[in-house]
C-alpha cells in the first residue's frame, strides 16, 4: 500500500478582505498547518528497487537504508568510510566515494548501475566560526575553510544531477530526496553558513519541483531539527532532552526520508507557469517534512498557499504571469 497524505488542519485567521487587491487574479490561500502520521508499516514493498544514499554509512542515511532494506530494496551506500560492523543491512553494498569529487560520484553511480531512489544525505557541520577573525602566520586574515559548502551544497547538487541523469536515461521515473535542515527555515545563529546552505537546498527542491515531473521524477526534502547522529552526539543532545526539548532519533528522520520517496499526494504544492490544475493526484513532490522530536510537519504547501500574504497579492500575480510567459515546457 502506497502511503497517502492525510492532513490534520489547523485554521489560521486571516483578514483577507484587507489584504486582497481586487484587480489581482490569484486565489485566496488555503491556510492550514499539516501534520503527518508516518509509520513504517505503511511503507510499500520495494522489491526490485535500487536505492543510492550519500552519507549512507551512519546516522540518518544508515537509518533510512535499513528501512528501505526491510521493504525489499537493494541499497548502495556512498560514503568515505564503511558502516560499523553489523550495522548495514544485508542487501546493501558500500561504495567508497567522496561526494565533493565528480569523478568519484560518477564512478559510484556507474557501479550501482541503476537508480530508482536517490537520497542526497551526506553533510558536515560548520567547521569554524565563519565570521570571527582568524589569522595566518603572517598575521593576515585567514581564508575560511569551505568543506561545509563543498559537501553540503556542491556535493548535493552533483549527486542530484547524476541521479536525475540516470533516471531520465532509464525512462522509468524515480525519486530524489534531499536531507536539508530545520535551520533552512529557522536559521541557527551559531551556524550561519550551514543554515544558509540548507536554505539553498530547500530552494533547489522548489526550483526543480515543476520540471522533474515531466520525467516522472519527484524531488523532496526532509528538514531535521535536533537529531542524535555524529553531528549531534548524545552528550550534546542529552541536555536538550533533559530540558524537555524535542530531539529526534535517526530512525525518525530516516522514516521521513523513505516516506518522501514513496508517498503520493492529492494535490500539488503549487502551480507554476502555464499550469492551472492544483488538485492533481500524483507522486509526493516538491515538499519538505520537518522532523521535530517525534512530530512530522509538511512545510511547503502552507508556505505556497500563503504566498500572496507574505509576498504580496500583486507581486504574486505579476510574478506568476512572468513565469507563465517564460515557461519553456
Swiss-Prot record:
Family from the record: Belongs to the short-chain dehydrogenases/reductases (SDR) family.
Mutant lacking the gene: phenotype: Reduces the production of PR-toxin and leads to a large increase in mycophenolic acid production.
Stated role: Short-chain dehydrogenase/reductase; part of the gene cluster that mediates the biosynthesis of PR-toxin, a bicyclic sesquiterpene belonging to the eremophilane class and acting as a mycotoxin. The first step of the pathway is catalyzed by the aristolochene synthase which performs the cyclization of trans,trans-farnesyl diphosphate (FPP) to the bicyclic sesquiterpene aristolochene. Following the formation of aristolochene, the non-oxygenated aristolochene is converted to the trioxygenated intermediate eremofortin B, via 7-epi-neopetasone.
The EC number(s) this enzyme carries: 1.1.99.-
Top enzyme category: oxidoreductase
Sorted UniProt keywords: Glycoprotein, Membrane, NADP, Oxidoreductase, Transmembrane, Transmembrane helix
Naturally occurring in which organism (per UniProt): Penicillium roqueforti
GO molecular function, one term: oxidoreductase activity
Membrane topology reported for the UniProt record: Single-pass membrane protein
The UniProt record lists the keyword Oxidoreductase: yes
Transmembrane segments: 238-258
Protein's UniProt name: Short-chain dehydrogenase/reductase prx4
Pathway(s) of this molecule: Sesquiterpene biosynthesis
InterPro entries listed in its UniProt record: NAD(P)-bd_dom_sf (IPR036291), SDR_fam (IPR002347)
Compartment(s) of residence: Membrane
Domain of life per record: Eukaryota
Entry annotation: catalytic residues: 194 (proton acceptor), 198 (lowers pka of active site tyr)
Pfam families the record matches: adh_short
SUPFAM superfamilies: NAD(P)-binding Rossmann-fold domains (SSF51735)
Binding positions (NADP(+)): 58, 60, 81, 98, 121, 161, 194, 198, 229
Glycan-modified residues: 91
GO CC, alphabetical: membrane
